[in-house]
């Protein structure tokens, strides 16, 4: 498996500067990563720097808490696309989900998908804050929307994706809904395991070291 092309090479630290983003972009070019995942403020810069490449620009909406007003999330998504984003990773409203206001969740996701049209929409459910039963319910909920992916984590909670998270999501998702694993993916073993469990996209800031380990592994044989 060519993992490079299904990695979203990620830099979402609040202290990241334009120079840090340029370094991220050069790494993405060097290692042929499928996409970079950055904060909305850097999308215009990335669009310019990635001209004449096939590397996609992923940005985040309602990040990292998900509790912004829906209209703000919609506007943020619309502006991100206008600035050159190819894909949107939005954070589900965790509080509304916890109090079982499921129609709110469905409406918000579908409104943002309508806003971005044919662009890819991933919904972050923040598995660290959910019980296994809630992860199952959230997966079914996202499956009922027009979202393209369900994503495990922001990387800003107390843990990222786990094997059990992936198993629960895989067991409860619709056939059309793809899985992005993110948060705490620091080594090749995790990525290979999550891939076997159904993840077809990966968000990680450790992309370079993971791919270097993969190359070393191949060179041993």
UniProtKB/Swiss-Prot annotation:
Catalytic activity, reaction form: 2-deoxy-D-ribose 5-phosphate = D-glyceraldehyde 3-phosphate + acetaldehyde
Compartments, record wording: Cytoplasm
A single GO molecular function term of this UniProt record: deoxyribose-phosphate aldolase activity
Domain of life: Bacteria
Active-site feature positions: 89, 151, 180
EC numbers on record: 4.1.2.4
Pathway linked to the protein: Carbohydrate degradation; 2-deoxy-D-ribose 1-phosphate degradation; D-glyceraldehyde 3-phosphate and acetaldehyde from 2-deoxy-alpha-D-ribose 1-phosphate: step 2/2
Descriptive protein name: Deoxyribose-phosphate aldolase
Organism classification: Bacteria, Bacillati, Mycoplasmatota, Mycoplasmoidales, Metamycoplasmataceae
The gene coding this protein: deoC
């Amino acid at each position: 498996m060519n993992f490079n092309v299904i990695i979203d090479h990620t830099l979402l630290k609040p202290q990241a500067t334009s120079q840090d983003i340029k370094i991220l972009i050069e790494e993405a070019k060097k290692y042929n990563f499928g996409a970079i995942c950055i904060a909305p403020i850097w999308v215009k810069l990335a669009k310019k720097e990635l001209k004449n490449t096939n590397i996609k620009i992923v940005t985040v909406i309602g990040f990292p808490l998900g509790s912004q007003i829906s209209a703000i999330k919609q506007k943020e998504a619309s502006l991100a696309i206008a600035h050159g984003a190819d894909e949107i990773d939005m954070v589900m409203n965790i509080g509304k989900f916890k109090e079982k206001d499921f129609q709110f969740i469905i409406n918000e996701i579908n409104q943002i998908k309508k806003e971005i049209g044919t662009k890819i929409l991933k919904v972050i459910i923040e598995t660290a804050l959910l019980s296994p039963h809630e992860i199952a319910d959230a997966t079914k909920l996202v499956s009922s929307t027009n979202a393209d992916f369900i994503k495990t984590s922001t990387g800003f909670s107390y843990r990222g994706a786990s094997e059990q998270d992936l198993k629960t999501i895989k067991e409860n998702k619709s056939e059309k809904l793809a899985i992005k694993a993110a948060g705490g993916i620091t080594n090749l073993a995790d990525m290979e395991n999550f891939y076997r469990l159904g993840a077809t996209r990966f968000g990680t800031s450790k992309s370079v070291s993971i791919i270097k380990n993969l190359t070393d592994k191949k060179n041993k044989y």
